[in-house]
Amino acid sequence: MTAGQWRSHLTDDQQRQVRDLVTVATQVDGVAPVGEQVLRELAQQRTEHLLVEDQSPGKSAIGYLNLSPAHGADAAMAELVVHPQARRRGIATAMVRAALAKTGGRNQFWAHGTLAPARATASALGLTPVRELVQMRRSLRQLPEPVIPNGLQIRTYAGTEDDAELLRVNNAAFAYHPEQGGWTEADLAERRGEPWFDPAGLFLALEGSEGAEDSPSGQPRLLGFHWTKIHLDDPGLGEVYVLGVDPAAQGRGLGRTLTMIGLRSLTQRLGDRDLGHESTVMLYVESDNIAAVRTYQGLGFSTHSVDTAYALAAPDAALA
């Protein structure tokens, strides 16, 4: 089985085929095979695409791999999907081998949900887990009241005039993080353009007026934020999309306060829908961030699934 050719551009029809492929795999597996960033990249030319098509006259996509380039110390990252009816034909193995060959074995692979086929492919190719991202969930019922510390202002996103402070806090809070750190204005603009974006769901915690002189703009300084999201394709599901606290403001309980304010908002916004079932909120946290995991457990969250990043332990030796 060959993996096809690398492409830096996908046609509109190819993008549609990949989205359809992801939808089918999600319905069968119960977990999306790729993250939302991969779907954003389909129309861009910032990543490499590997497309495997069947031999029917329409040549529909039965396999897809997205390879994002390395950034500084962060390895190149691949995410892939194979059509459920085309599995056990070596397609995933061929795509993984192609990605390893392209990067000299120095990339990682996300396995969303860490499903059995992904574990088997990783084992067969000598890939080992290097990172785990835990998805945690809880019901939006019986939420504790948020406690807002004295001298703290809470408001929602007012527009692009908030972007500079948002970027400052985000990049300070996630300086270590491969995906969330190093954001630019373009990253914010992309997410504002998403259909789910709602400025009323982005909460800002600012220092009281006595701290205004600490901000370059002369406005109250941003201490933290909670960006919530409602999943339009999964009624009743909300998300703690990004929760960031300025490292200089940690230890004041801002994370808990912002979390509860956001969850209360999700409850109200999802409560307007006739769902027929209980509303739920999800979030992602690195498995080795023990303090954060324990904090969320204390707020009633429990593990729903785990995404695993795999890589070669010794790329040079493995590819020699």
Curated annotation (Swiss-Prot):
1D-myo-inositol 2-(L-cysteinylamino)-2-deoxy-alpha-D-glucopyranoside binds at residues 36, 179, 229, 239, 284. Its EC number is 2.3.1.189. GO terms for molecular function: mycothiol synthase activity; protein-N-terminal-alanine acetyltransferase activity. InterPro entries: Acyl_CoA_acyltransferase, GNAT_dom, MshD_Acetyltransferase, Mycothiol_AcTrfase. GO terms for biological process: mycothiol biosynthetic process. It comes from the Bacteria. Keywords: Acyltransferase, Repeat, Transferase. Monomer. This is Mycothiol acetyltransferase.
